[in-house]
Curated annotation (Swiss-Prot):
The gene is rpmF1. HAMAP family: Ribosomal_bL32 (MF_00340). Keywords: Ribonucleoprotein, Ribosomal protein. SUPFAM superfamilies: Zn-binding ribosomal proteins. One of its GO terms (cellular component) is large ribosomal subunit. Belongs to the bacterial ribosomal protein bL32 family. Residues 1-22 are annotated as: Disordered. Residues 7-20 have a biased composition (Basic residues). One of its GO terms (molecular function) is structural constituent of ribosome. This is Large ribosomal subunit protein bL32A.
Amino acid sequence: MAVPARRTSKTKKRLRRTHEKLKSPEISFDENLGDYRKSHHVSLKGYYGGKKVMDKK
C-alpha cells in the first residue's frame, strides 16, 4: 500500500481544495417576460429564446 513520503503542507492541501467550492447558479433576467431564469433553461412560463416551447401544466 502506498504511503506518502512527506506530509502535505497546509498550503498544498488548501490549493488542491480551492476547486471544491460550490458555484452560484447562473441566473439571467428575461426582459420580454420580466422574469428570472437559469441560463440555457426554459423559463417557468414555458418560454425559451422568446418562443413558447412548453405548455405550463
